[in-house]
């Protein structure tokens, strides 16, 4: 009886994974067909530039003005992005998932090609780590709303460009957000080391 139940469970799990994969590729195919590629290219590029540029600009300004609280904020935001990208790239090369345009060249049109594996989305992880850490640091609606919309736009852009599955983007968002919250505790220790 145990073997029958185990066999049924294995078949059900396999069927659920096939269904999830179908949802993933069907969503990419649909979103990839939307003609928003210029906007997506802009969002996608900003997802690589802003997560580095914002904390760097904050840090440089803080050093020039000798503003230690701002420098602490820059360190928190910058280390959050670094942590998110570290986790993301460790997973990317451990899992080594093919990009949608490589696995389904007849169904997905790549707007831009990438050299790294697909899962999870590094651009999305970086965008959500920046958006979440900014929102935690400056909890005002005029910081939270635009940064959240921008991060979601980066995730959408990666699917629209055909370079990621929705599961890549969702996992990247979870990693980026999670690193921002985890880094609150890590930076308490780091602030003692750097600033006291």
Go through each PLM region and give its residues.
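Membrane-water interface at transmembrane helix exits
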Residues: 15, 61, 88-96, 135, ...
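N-terminal transmembrane-helix/juxtamembrane module of multi-pass inner/ER membrane proteins
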Residues: 16-58, 72, 89-116
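Juxtamembrane loop-transmembrane helix junctions in multi-pass integral membrane proteins
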Residues: 35-42, 69, 135-138, 142
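Interfacial segments of alpha-helical transmembrane regions
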Residues: 63-86
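Short helix-capping/hinge motifs at transmembrane helix termini and TM-loop junctions
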Residues: 64-66, 95-96, 139, 162
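Membrane-embedded catalytic cores of phosphoryl/pyrophosphoryl-handling enzymes
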Residues: 105-196
